[in-house]
C-alpha cells in the first residue's frame, strides 16, 4: 500500500530495486494500455505525411517517432509509426491519450474513403523486454536472428515467441537494449510465461511504470502532457531531431517556422539537482531564483537510480 508523501515514500526502495535489475539483468513490463491503430488505404501515406512533422519510415518494418502539431506549432500528439506496406502504417501512442489522438486523426482524415482508421488497442497486447540480457532471453524462445546487423534499432519484424506470433519492435522507453513485443492479446499469458521461464537463469523480473518513468527521465525522454504540450513550440521542447521544416507541407509547419523567426521564449532542458536527501521534484514545481523570481517550471521530476542523483 502506498503511503503518499511529498517526500520519498515507501515505494522508493522498490522502484530502485526494479531499475537496478533492468539495468543489470532484464525486466518485463506490460504496456498493453498503449493506444494502437492501423492507418491504411491508397491515401494513407500522403495523409500521415501531412499530419506529422517527421519523415515517415520508407522501408517496410522501419519505425519513426512522429509528432502531430497544432495549428500554432505546439505538440498535440506523439506516435510511434511503423510502415507495414506501401499503403498501411501501424501507430502506437500513449494509452491515456487514445481518445484525444484518435479523434485528432479522424478530424483530419479525408472523407473520400482513401484513408481508413482501425482501432487495435483491445486486440493487441504489448510486453516490453528490456535490459542487457534481453537478447539472450528472447533468443531462447525464437528462431529469429536478433543480432544488431539483422535486427537494428528502430526496426520491427514478425517473429515467433515460443511458437506464438509477435511483432517485435526494437524500441523502448527506458534506454536499454530491448524489444516491444506486440501480439494478439489471446497469446499474452503464453508469451509472458515463456519469457519468464526463459529469463529465470538471467535474472528476469517484472518491473512497473514508476521504474520506467525513473529511467526515461535519465534519458531525457519526453512525455506528451508534461514535456510536450500545445502551449510550447515543438522546437522549444527540443524536438529538432523529429521536426523537419523542409520536408514538405505539414500541419503547423508555417506557424512553427514563423514562431522560430520571432524567437522562442522557452527551452526544454534536463536539470540535475544535487544534495537532496529525501525529496525530489515531481513535476509542476516552479523553478525560482534565490530572490523568489519564477524563471521556469519542472515538467517532470524524480530520482535517477542509475545515476545516483
Predicted features and spans:
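Glycine/proline-enriched, intrinsically flexible loops and inter-domain linkers
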Residues: 1-309
